[in-house]
Amino acid sequence: MDKQPAHHKESKMVITYDQRRPEIDDIIAIYQSSGIKRPVQDADRIREMYRHANLVITAWDGEKPVGIARALTDFSYCCYLSDLAVRAEYQHQGIGKRLIGEVKQAVGEQSMLLLLSAPAAMDYYPKIGMETVSNGFMIKRTG
């Protein structure tokens, strides 16, 4: 994926999107700023989360990572978007929507994209064109 600039109407900033992986400290900073609940106190666990992810799309303001989408996919049938996070000061500018779009483009039209939403974000995803599903199940983590 080439860097793809996006001009945001609310400011003169140019956000680029690509598959560079930020440093772990930068990922943790994005998580902390965004409000997403992840084990940010455990850098080794975050490192492992990214080591095993096979698709990561990032949003950059110059050399500063401002948003991230982490996914697990087979690139042919299904893609699980496990993380979507945008720094608080960059939210409400279309960056999250664009990150989801970049993930969908990377996995192709033949792949379904699914995610688990935080309760606070349940109203967000339908606004950007995602459907709510009720036929899912999970076994919660114990650690």
Where are these regions (language model features)?
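Alpha-helix N-cap/helix-start capping motif
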Residues: 21, 75, 118-119
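Hydrophobic adenine-recognition pocket in adenosine-nucleotide-binding enzymes
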Residues: 84-86, 121
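Conserved active-site alpha-helix within GNAT-family acetyltransferase domains
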Residues: 111-115, 119-142
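Conserved acetyl-CoA pyrophosphate-binding loop and the N-cap/start of the following alpha-helix
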Residues: 90, 94-99
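Short amphipathic alpha-helix that is part of the acyltransferase structural core
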Residues: 2-43, 136
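A conserved beta-strand-loop-helix scaffold within acyl/acetyltransferase catalytic domains
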Residues: 45-84
